[in-house]
């Protein structure tokens, strides 16, 4: 009869003990936990700026976190970044992270942070616990635009003030402003040409004005047509003598007879108004109307922050329109940190 502790029994007991060890130690080590993953087996990560990581031992962290850089964290915020596993260096995974960035910015230092399943030294990490920490730096173009904006700080301050008044929220008042301007122009034209104002009496003189002596040789004139000033009509010709259609408006004595604006003043004002409206129709493509200031063309690219020091224009600028940001694919390279 074989002993229970014989060689055959010893081998059987060893296998049974190993099986029991695997059943008890395996779950403790996370071998059967679907949330436990070997770090080097993670092939890619897709991270979002408005989401948090999973957590088990520690608090969750943002999937994307800017930690500094020459451009600062408030200048631009990428929405989605994808990181790919580029290899194993014997201790950590090396990552290449890509996203679309404004042409003024680039990635600085990057590091992928993952929560170790049991500790910060564990090769296994919790699924979904990885996030990216990155620095945001200026490109050469961004530094150039930054220097240019520093030289034009005064103009930038004016444009900031202008944008507050002529933002998209106030564009619905443009029609009202146009009506007010047109009414003002109509009032000025009425006062200059159609309104018969009050005139001051002529200065005392022993001799009558030249126009009065001239009228002795002409027949009396009737009243001027309704709606027009008398100095624009003058004495009417009834067939005897020669008179001018504009009468005393062109005589040397008008300064004594009329203290209000004369024909030449009205003509000059009309010319100025015509020039303003003509300039509006011949405006450059960089302005929308004569009461919106024109902006010169700048480098074809805009910056994400409204009226930040790096704000530029692509084509025309209007306070009531938006322009797209010019971007390109940027890459950042870094390793892994387990927490």
UniProtKB/Swiss-Prot annotation:
Signal peptide limits: 1-30
Cytoplasmic side: 195-339
Membrane topology: Single-pass type I membrane protein
Biased composition (Polar residues): 316-330
Keyword RNA-binding among UniProt keywords: no
Pfam families: SARAF
Region of interest (Disordered), ranges: 313-339
Biological process according to GO: calcium ion transport; regulation of store-operated calcium entry
Localization, UniProt: Endoplasmic reticulum membrane
GO cellular component, one term: endoplasmic reticulum-plasma membrane contact site
Family the UniProt entry places it in: Belongs to the SARAF family.
Recorded domain comment: The cytoplasmic C-terminal region mediates interaction with STIM1, while the N-terminal lumenal region mediates regulation of SOCE activity.
Record protein name field: Store-operated calcium entry-associated regulatory factor
Organism name: Pongo abelii (Sumatran orangutan)
Taxonomic placement: Eukaryota, Metazoa, Chordata, Craniata, Vertebrata
């Amino acid at each position: 009869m074989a002993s229970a502790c014989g060689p055959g029994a010893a081998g059987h007991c060893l296998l049974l003990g190993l099986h029991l060890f695997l059943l008890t130690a395996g779950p403790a080590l996370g071998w059967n936990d679907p949330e436990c993953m070997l770090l080097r087996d993670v092939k890619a990560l897709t991270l979002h700026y408005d989401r948090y990581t999973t957590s088990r031992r520690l608090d969750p962290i943002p999937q994307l976190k800017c930690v500094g850089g020459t451009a600062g964290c408030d200048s631009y915020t990428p929405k989605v970044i994808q990181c790919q596993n580029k290899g194993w260096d014997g201790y950590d995974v090396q990552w290449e992270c890509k996203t679309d960035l404004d042409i003024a910015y680039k990635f600085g230092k990057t590091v992928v942070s993952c929560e170790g399943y049991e500790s910060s030294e564990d090769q296994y990490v919790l699924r979904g616990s990885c996030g990216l920490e990155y620095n945001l730096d200026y490109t050469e173009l961004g530094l150039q635009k930054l220097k240019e904006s520093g030289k034009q700080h005064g103009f930038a301050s004016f444009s900031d003030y202008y944008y507050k008044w002529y933002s998209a929220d106030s564009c619905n008042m443009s029609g009202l402003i146009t009506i007010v301007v047109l009414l003002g122009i109509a009032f000025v034209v009425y006062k200059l040409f159609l309104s018969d104002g009050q005139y001051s009496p002529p200065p005392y003189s022993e001799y009558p004005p030249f126009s009065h002596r001239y009228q002795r040789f002409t027949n009396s004139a009737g009243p001027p047509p309704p709606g027009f000033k008398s100095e624009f009509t003058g004495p009417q010709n009834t067939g005897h003598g020669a008179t001018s259609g504009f009468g005393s408006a062109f005589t040397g004595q008008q300064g004594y007879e009329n203290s209000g604006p004369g024909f030449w003043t009205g003509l000059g004002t009309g010319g100025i108004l015509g020039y303003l409206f003509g300039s509006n129709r011949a405006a450059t493509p960089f302005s929308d109307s004569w009461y919106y200031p024109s902006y010169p063309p700048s480098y074809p690219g805009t910056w994400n922050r409204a009226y930040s020091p790096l704000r530029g224009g692509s084509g025309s600028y209007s306070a009531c329109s938006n322009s797209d940001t010019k971007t390109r694919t940027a890459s950042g390279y870094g390793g892994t940190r387990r927490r």
